[in-house]
Amino acid sequence: MPRVKRGVQARARHKKVLKQAKGYYGARSRVYRVAFQAVTKAGQYAYRDRRNKKRQFRQLWIARINAASRQNGLSYSRFINGLKKASIEIDRKILADIAVFDKAAFAVLVEKAKASL
């Protein structure tokens, strides 16, 4: 059985990890063993937070819609219920955008929701 030397592969693997760790503080960007742990943990955080981002944006949209609809005299849940009954299908992202940037149009939506309750 011939001897297998894996220096080239190991060097390439180490370079890849250290490249990913570029910009990290101290040994995390220089020492392979520490950098590997840091990069692995960063990947776990990234995976988790890609999912959390969707939840957080939905929470933000709901908070904005709730604030704007209460300014027009209607709670969030009654507003959404009114829109569903009026068969107005606008998602929360767009509703939040309208609430922030076009208050007059949002007021019209609130009136339509009130009318359909």
From Swiss-Prot:
Molecular-function annotations in GO: rRNA binding; structural constituent of ribosome
GO cellular component, one term: ribonucleoprotein complex
GO biological process: ribosomal large subunit assembly; translation
PROSITE patterns, A to Z: RIBOSOMAL_L20
Listed SUPFAM superfamilies: Ribosomal protein L20 (SSF74731)
Superkingdom: Bacteria
InterPro entries on file: Ribosomal_bL20, RIBOSOMAL_L20_CS, Ribosomal_protein_bL20_C
Keywords assigned: Ribonucleoprotein, Ribosomal protein, RNA-binding, rRNA-binding
Statement: the UniProt record of this protein carries the keyword Ribonucleoprotein: yes
One of the Pfam families matching this protein, by short name: Ribosomal_L20
Role played: Binds directly to 23S ribosomal RNA and is necessary for the in vitro assembly process of the 50S ribosomal subunit. It is not involved in the protein synthesizing functions of that subunit.
Family as reported in the entry's similarity comment: Belongs to the bacterial ribosomal protein bL20 family.
Stored PANTHER family: 39S RIBOSOMAL PROTEIN L20
Designated name of the protein: Large ribosomal subunit protein bL20
